[in-house]
């Protein structure tokens, strides 16, 4: 497995001094680098030792394990929260001290503001002592401001690090658990859900730690402020506080509603992402079946449900944001209305001290406190989901029992087990067998007999209900569907072992990979993507086998590895790899290829989970039991022993000498013809995930907003926002004006000594009330409308992206790993649904506030503009400097996140393999390495934003200091109201300004998600689904296919995989297509289905395929694909997604493929929901479902792509027989590795290196000893070749000379005087 990240820079924080830590100076070199060039992974600092994934995960896991034990003792449910608290409470509690100091400073600040305003109210130009005292107050005010600037960011940095630690530890635990899940537990969860835990749920820890301390700091601060307000304005302060108190339960109600909506949303999101995962995985099949519309409807419906919940929760959020915006105004309004009505006179110092005090407590009470409640309630939901996952059943730990006497053994006795306890019939019943070193145990039986389950029992994946399995020795396992992980081919084969050249070369040779490595562009250094996207099926199977052989285990469990390769390679693998390289091992081989049974030490026949027969090949022949009939029906002739009397290898009939002689002497396809690159799947290499550079363009914003609403509506929204802000400021200005008038009136009163008149209270109060009401209305309206537009935009863009994905050519899915495409649908759409609208609204509100603060300050004290100019310049330069680096850091964070998910989903796909090789530890290390890489990026993301914020707040602090001291210098020309307004406004600027700038950067960062989604909305499209030129209704009547000089490549820059192919396939002809792995067989089908556009012409019944719509073309051909795909949903949906058939037709189709009973046994019959990707059916059964689909479609052209590779001979025969009956009137093309399935075809097409080498009747080709087809048949061994030639001859004469009675001489071959179980097959089409 590849190292994740090569070079590591030491973390400068470890050696930083106190000043450097306070102001984040240690980051300066990084910013310099970011200013000069684009940052890469090598620029990131290594993770601090205490933040390493392994350390954090194991620490928390320890606490969780203790908690589980304690809960068991106390007979209660374990609590994950308890484990988290016990693990982290000390370090987190210390951070509370920061909160305490910071909030105290916030509360004390207004007192000094009041003293300065007081000085202006009692202004006396001769009193120098008062002036000096005022300067003292200004200094203390400035000091408070500086303390806040530094402390706030230190606190935030530390709590976010705490959040990161919990998240990383959780991910480590989730992955560790995923590797240990029992199979019954895997049934209860899906890959999608586990990925969702890792992509969404754990992120809640990052957010909850930030606000948690405010749960106690909020109420404390409120008490402090109340006391100060009481001193300042007496009992009327209670009126204002009453509003605050009313707001709290209102907000917690909103919070509760919000969290219930969130958990519903999460369920819908899970379902959508799960379905999306399957759609992307099965895209090739969906395209060939032309099922896009059905899946589009499915996803659209899921998305509609999800969006309705998201809109609901967004409106609640909108109300919350609005209440934050207007709370202050309402509180001040109520307070001063009460104050005035109680007969008090308004003064500037009262107004602005109260305003600032309320401002201090308002942030905490209306934002941090409710956020804490909301985040805690979200975190509780997430912790519950994670806890439920962590409590799922695990596989019992199996000790790898080393053989005591050095002898490996597999012993199974009376073994009975169920995959699903709900079903009445056990999966395996009463199995008993023993296998010892040097034995090859072959397991055969029809589809669904329990062959793979038998291997899983030996692996320990299927726990026994009764009976016993004892395994001594190390196991290697090769799964039926090959599993490879992202990395090079070599790292897949080594699978964590040391590279030993000699052993490696031997393994490569035994697994027939040598030739492939010469042809692959980078040999075994080729990097294969997710699910081995760049290897053909046969290559993947051989790489898997090579992995097993290289491990040098004692016991080999091989689940039908020979079915994915052609006969010649299969023979090579069997002789060289299974019989020779593994001859001293215990080998249990599940196979459908009966010709190899002769070499087996024992044969085990399974049917319906029970062992029908067990014995050696010769015993079966002697006793003539049922196996004989099974063989008669299905055996493809077993190879006769090379020379009687040659020394045998552990009684396998191939001797070493004969194998080597065969190797060197036989004329082979491999020697004869230079083989082209394995062109089947050498699509273009997996490109790096694109990281767009530089600014987010205006175009992205334009597309985003126009997706949400019409331009007319957007202009209206802008005006609404501006008007709201104007009224917001007017309300404060009116209060200041009122205080000034009142002050002037008092002064006159004092000067004259008699009352000259009072202010008209109703006039001032009336206007004040009006302004407040309008502010509230505008505040709420703009909040809700912004959310409406942005959620709508997310919905529109999701639909466009999904539509674009459905219309993208297959190449796109081969080039991009599932994780990368899914990331857009989960992470990026998640951002657009949830965080972007919230951040955007927040940004607009704070930006407008900042602008109004500066405007008011400048209107009152024009000279403020003088220091503003240099401060603004510094700010602009700083922001640009910061964004150069922060953008790169954010993108690095996104791109280092993908591998974490890819590694998880890849591990889940190869779970059995990983466990069989005991590679959990190694996978866990790799996962931790991926996590650490992501933590490096995340750590930089946190610290760089703090670096910027500290500097911004410093600019604001300078602004406050200038205003405070400046107003004292100009004391003569100012009155108290003006100073109060300017100073109190500039104090609110402190947190507000840096928050608005950070939110602007945040919006820009989140717009990357929008950009990534928009990038997928205009992918290259395949041809249109429907064209104006529609084929006639019953087309094709005949099913004649003409290839006219066809060249085919998967991508413009890729190699040609079909070259100058010209062929005519007549109506109702059955054509077999053969050739080595990678000869271009599957590409021929891709060209026919136009999965990529072919050059040259392909005609079907005189209609040029490139002239009609893709759906018109694809719907008219049926395909039984190589890898059968079922989708989550009902069996009915899987057979007939468009509801075009009646129940009766569906049951009839199922009956014809002998699945009716299996489906009737399900609890909901045809409406039973299938497990993810139909994993509750065996591969063979899934293949039969594909056949049922083809039967239902009743098309004139049927294509079979190695469909019977994974099924037993009986099912194979069933499929062949159904194809003969049902598709007699159709044109059938069959790609086959088993030559017996196509020997009775009308024609055989032999492809090699993308060229059509031979095309004629099988018998005609077999008459020419130089033909490739002849050589292929001869490689099966003399007897088998004779039998096939005989069949071909009969078919030939029956077809061409029907009048001549043709009887075949019995073919009888004896080996050692024993009649071999040789029969002629009436199989295939």
Swiss-Prot record:
Compositionally biased region (Polar residues): 658-667
Transmembrane segments: 93-113, 136-156, 205-225, 227-247, 322-342, 351-371, 710-730, 761-781, 836-856, 858-878, 954-974, 977-997
GO terms for biological process, alphabetical: bile acid and bile salt transport; cAMP transport; cilium assembly; export across plasma membrane; leukotriene transport; positive regulation of smooth muscle cell proliferation; prostaglandin secretion; prostaglandin transport
Cofactor: Mg(2+)
E.C. number: 7.6.2.-, 7.6.2.2, 7.6.2.3
Modification after translation: N-glycosylated; leading to substrate-selective effects on its transport activity.
This protein's record includes keyword Transmembrane helix: yes
Membrane association type: Multi-pass membrane protein
Protein name: ATP-binding cassette subfamily C member 4
Record has Transmembrane helix as a keyword: yes
PANTHER family (UniProt xref): ATP-BINDING CASSETTE SUB-FAMILY C, ATP-BINDING CASSETTE SUB-FAMILY C MEMBER 4
Residues annotated as domain ABC transmembrane type-1: 93-377, 715-1005
Tissue expression from the record: Ubiquitous with high levels in kidney.
MF terms in GO: ABC-type bile acid transporter activity; ABC-type glutathione S-conjugate transporter activity; ABC-type xenobiotic transporter activity; ATP binding; ATP hydrolysis activity; ATPase-coupled transmembrane transporter activity; efflux transmembrane transporter activity; glutathione transmembrane transporter activity
Quaternary data: Interacts (via PDZ-binding motif) with SNX27 (via PDZ domain); this interaction accelerates MRP4 internalization.
Annotated catalysed reactions: ATP + H2O + xenobioticSide 1 = ADP + phosphate + xenobioticSide 2; an S-substituted glutathione(in) + ATP + H2O = an S-substituted glutathione(out) + ADP + phosphate + H(+); 17beta-estradiol 17-O-(beta-D-glucuronate)(in) + ATP + H2O = 17beta-estradiol 17-O-(beta-D-glucuronate)(out) + ADP + phosphate + H(+); dehydroepiandrosterone 3-sulfate(in) + ATP + H2O = dehydroepiandrosterone 3-sulfate(out) + ADP + phosphate + H(+)
Cell compartment(s), UniProt: Basolateral cell membrane; Apical cell membrane
Major subcellular site: membrane
């Amino acid at each position: 497995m590849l190292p994740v990240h090569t070079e590591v820079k030491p973390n400068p924080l470890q050696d930083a001094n106190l000043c450097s830590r306070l102001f984040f100076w240690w980051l300066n070199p990084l910013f310099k680098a970011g200013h000069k060039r684009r940052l890469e992974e090598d620029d990131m600092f290594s993770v601090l030792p205490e933040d390493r994934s392994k350390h954090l995960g194991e620490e928390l896991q320890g606490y969780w394990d203790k908690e589980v034990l304690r809960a068991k003792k106390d007979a209660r449910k374990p609590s994950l929260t308890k484990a988290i608290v016990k693990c982290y409470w000390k370090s987190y509690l210390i951070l509370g001290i920061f909160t305490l100091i910071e909030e105290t400073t916030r509360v004390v600040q207004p007192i000094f503001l009041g003293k300065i305003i007081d000085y202006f109210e009692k202004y006396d130009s001769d009193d120098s002592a008062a002036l000096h005292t005022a300067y003292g107050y200004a200094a203390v005010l400035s000091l408070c401001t500086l303390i806040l600037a530094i402390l706030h960011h230190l606190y935030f940095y530390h709590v976010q690090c705490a959040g990161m630690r919990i998240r990383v530890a959780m991910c480590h635990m989730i992955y560790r658990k995923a590797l240990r899940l029992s199979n019954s537990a895997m049934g209860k969860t899906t890959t999608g859900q586990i990925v969702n835990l890792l992509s969404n749920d754990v992120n809640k820890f990052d957010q909850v730690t930030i606000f948690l301390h405010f749960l106690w700091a909020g109420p404390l601060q409120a008490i402090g402020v109340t006391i100060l307000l009481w001193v300042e304005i007496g009992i009327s302060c209670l009126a204002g506080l009453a509003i605050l108190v009313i707001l709290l339960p209102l907000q917690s109600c909103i919070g509760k509603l919000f969290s219930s909506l969130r958990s519903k949303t999460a369920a819908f999101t899970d379902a959508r992402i799960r379905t999306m995962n399957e759609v992307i995985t099965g895209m090739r099949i969906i395209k060939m079946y032309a099922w896009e519309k059905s899946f589009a409807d499915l996803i659209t419906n899921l998305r509609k449900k999800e969006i309705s919940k998201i809109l609901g929760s967004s409106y609640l959020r909108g109300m919350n944001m609005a209440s934050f915006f207007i709370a202050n105004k309402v509180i001040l309004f109520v307070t001063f209305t009460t104050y005035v009505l109680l007969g008090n006179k308004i003064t500037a110092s009262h107004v602005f001290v109260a305003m600032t005090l309320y401002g201090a407590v308002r942030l905490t009470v209306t934002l941090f406190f409710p956020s804490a409640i909301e985040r805690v309630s979200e975190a509780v939901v997430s912790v519950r989901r994670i806890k439920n996952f962590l409590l799922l059943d695990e596989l019992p730990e199996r000790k790898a029992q080393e053989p005591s006497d050095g002898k490996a053994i597999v012993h199974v006795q009376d073994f009975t087990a169920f995959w699903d306890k709900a079903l009445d019939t056990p999966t395996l019943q009463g199995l008993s067998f023993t296998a010892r070193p040097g034995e090859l145990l072959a397991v055969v039986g029809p589809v669904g007999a329990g062959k793979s389950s038998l291997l899983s029992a030996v692996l320990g994946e299927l726990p026994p209900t009764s009976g016993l399995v004892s395994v001594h020795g190390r196991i290697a396992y090769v799964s039926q569907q090959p599993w490879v992980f992202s990395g090079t081919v070599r790292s897949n084969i080594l699978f964590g072992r040391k590279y030993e050249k000699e052993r490696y070369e031997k393994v490569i040779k035994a697994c027939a990979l040598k030739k492939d490595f010469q042809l692959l562009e980078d040999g075994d250094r080729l990097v294969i993507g997710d699910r081995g996207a760049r290897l053909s099926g046969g290559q993947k199977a051989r790489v898997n086998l090579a992995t097993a052989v290289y491990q040098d285990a004692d016991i080999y469990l091989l689940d039908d590895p020979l079915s994915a390769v052609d006969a010649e390679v299969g023979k090579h693998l069997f002789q060289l790899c299974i019989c020779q390289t593994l001859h001293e091992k215990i080998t249990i081989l599940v196979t459908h290829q009966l010709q190899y049974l002769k070499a087996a030490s024992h044969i085990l026949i399974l049917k319906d989970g029970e062992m029908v027969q067990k014995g050696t090949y010769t015993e079966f022949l002697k006793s003539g039991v049922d196996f004989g009939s099974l063989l008669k029906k299905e055996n493809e002739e077993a190879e006769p022993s090379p020379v009687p009397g040659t020394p045998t290898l552990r009684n396998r009939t191939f001797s070493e000498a004969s194998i080597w002689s065969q190797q060197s002497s036989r004329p082979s396809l491999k020697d004869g013809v230079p083989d082209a690159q394995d062109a089947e799947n050498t699509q273009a290499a997996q490109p790096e995930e694109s990281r767009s550079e530089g600014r987010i363009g205006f175009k992205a914003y334009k597309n985003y907003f126009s997706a949400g609403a019409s331009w007319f509506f957007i202009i209206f929204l802008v005006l609404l926002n501006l008007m709201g802000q104007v009224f917001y400021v007017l309300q404060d200005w009116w209060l200041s004006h009122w205080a000034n008038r009142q002050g002037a009136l008092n002064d006159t009163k004092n000067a004259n000594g008699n009352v000259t008149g009072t202010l008209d209270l109703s006039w001032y109060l009336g206007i004040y009330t009006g302004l407040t009401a309008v502010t509230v209305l505008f505040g709420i309206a703009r909040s809700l409308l912004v959310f409406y537009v942005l959620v709508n935009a997310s919905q529109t863009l999701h639909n466009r992206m999904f539509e674009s994905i459905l219309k993208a050519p297959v190449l796109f899915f081969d080039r991009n790993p599932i994780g990368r495409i899914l990331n857009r649908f989960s992470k990026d759409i998640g951002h657009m649904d949830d965080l972007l609208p919230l951040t955007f609204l927040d940004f607009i509100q704070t930006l407008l506030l900042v602008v109004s603060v500066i405007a008011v300050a400048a209107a009152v004290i024009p000279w403020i503009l003088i220091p503003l100019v240099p401060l603004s310049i510094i700010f602009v330069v700083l922001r640009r400097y910061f964004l150069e680096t922060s953008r790169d850091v954010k993108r690095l964070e996104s791109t280092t996140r993908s591998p974490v998910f890819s590694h998880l989903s890849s591990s889940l796909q190869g779970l059995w393999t990983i466990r069989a090789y005991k590679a959990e530890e190694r996978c866990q290390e790799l996962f931790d390495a991926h996590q650490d890489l992501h933590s490096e990026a995340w750590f930089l993301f946190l610290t760089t934003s703090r670096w910027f914020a500290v500097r911004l707040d410093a600019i604001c602090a300078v602004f406050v200091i200038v205003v405070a001291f400046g107003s004292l210098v100009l004391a003569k020309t100012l009155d108290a109201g003006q100073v109060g307004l300017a100073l109190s406004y500039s104090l609110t600027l402190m947190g507000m300004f840096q928050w608005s700038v950070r939110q602007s950067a945040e919006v820009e960062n989140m717009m990357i998600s929008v950009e990534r989604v928009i990038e997928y909305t205009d992918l290259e499209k395949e041809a249109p689904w429907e064209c104006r030129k529609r084929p006639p209704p019953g087309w094709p009547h005949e099913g004649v296919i003409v290839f006219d000089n066809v060249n085919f490549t998967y991508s413009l820059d890729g190699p040609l995989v079909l070259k100058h192919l010209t062929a005519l396939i007549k109506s109702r002809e059955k054509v077999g297509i053969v050739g080595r792995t990678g000869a271009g067989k599957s590409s021929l089908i891709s060209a026919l289905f136009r999965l990529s556009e072919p050059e040259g012409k392909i005609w079907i019944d005189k209609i040029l395929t490139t002239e009609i719509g893709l759906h018109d073309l694809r719907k008219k051909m049926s395909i039984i694909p190589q890898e059968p795909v079922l989708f989550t949903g009902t069996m009915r949906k899987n057979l007939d997604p468009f509801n075009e058939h009646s129940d009766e037709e569906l049951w009839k189709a199922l009956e014809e493929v002998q699945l009716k009973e299996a489906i009737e046994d399900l609890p909901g019959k045809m409406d039973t929901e299938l497990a993810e990707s139909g994993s509750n059916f065996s591969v063979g059964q899934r293949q039969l479902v594909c056949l049922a689909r083809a039967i239902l479609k009743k098309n004139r052209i049927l294509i079979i792509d190695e469909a019977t590779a994974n099924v037993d001979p009986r099912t194979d025969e069933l499929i062949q027989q159904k194809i003969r009956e049902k598709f007699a009137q159709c044109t059938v093309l069959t790609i086959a590795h088993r030559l017996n399935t196509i020997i009775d075809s009308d024609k055989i097409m032999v492809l090699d290196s993308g060229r059509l080498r031979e095309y004629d009747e099988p018998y005609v080709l077999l008459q020419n000893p130089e033909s490739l087809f002849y050589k292929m048949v001869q490689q099966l061994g003399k007897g088998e070749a004779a039998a096939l030639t005989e069949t071909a001859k009969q078919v030939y004469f029956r077809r061409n000379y029907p009048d001549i009675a043709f009887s075949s001489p019995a073919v009888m071959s004896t080996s050692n005087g024993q009649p071999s179980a040789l029969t002629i097959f009436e199989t295939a089409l």
